[in-house]
């Protein structure tokens, strides 16, 4: 008998063809039908990440964004991610990648891309020291100022680039950590 953990591409193909990560009521749908359902339930926000080093981490972020109803997922810096951790979510969310030859030293270029996205989005940096999500101030911002928010997360070890973190055109919010775990990783 073949070891099922050896042939990842076979496992991925089998999972996709059987809709294993699709809710039971949608398992008999085509992928196109499920895409249409997902698009009809999306909310007016996007999620992005900058210089995430773990390829599985990017995939898990894509899956989380998709489950929360994001329209888009932006990747700044990495050329690839491990699709195994998306468990099929990459089919149901628009993924935009901005690749840089040297992503670690592309801070100004990333900042310029985010400035460009201000035409369509309110850029919200998720970092320590910002307005706490759930606070009265955050509720007012979300209600009165934020249009199509693009929530940006920094790398696991370095956070957000300084050029991005200090940009006065971007909002800065904090999502307080709960429970006993140290991190998502």
Language-model-detected regions and their locations in the chain:
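Post-transcriptional modification and biogenesis factors for structured RNAs
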Residues: 1-185
């Amino acid at each position: 008998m073949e070891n099922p953990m050896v042939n990842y591409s076979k496992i991925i193909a089998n999972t996709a063809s059987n809709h294993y990560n699709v809710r039971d009521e949608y398992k008999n749908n085509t992928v196109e039908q499920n895409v249409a359902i997902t698009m009809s339930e999306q909310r007016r926000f996007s999620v992005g990440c900058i210089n995430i080093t773990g390829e599985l981490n990017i995939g898990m972020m894509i899956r989380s964004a998709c489950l929360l109803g994001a329209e888009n997922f932006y990747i700044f810096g990495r050329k690839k991610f491990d699709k195994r951790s998306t468990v099929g979510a990459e089919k149901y969310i628009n993924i935009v990648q901005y690749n840089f030859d040297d992503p670690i030293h592309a801070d100004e270029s990333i900042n310029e891309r985010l400035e460009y996205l201000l035409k369509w989005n309110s850029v919200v940096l998720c970092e320590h020291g910002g307005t706490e999500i759930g606070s009265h101030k955050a509720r007012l911002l979300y209600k009165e100022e934020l249009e199509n928010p693009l929530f940006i997360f920094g790398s696991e070890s370095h956070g957000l680039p300084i050029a991005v973190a200090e940009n006065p055109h971007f909002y800065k919010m904090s999502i307080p950590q709960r429970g006993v775990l140290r991190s998502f990783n």
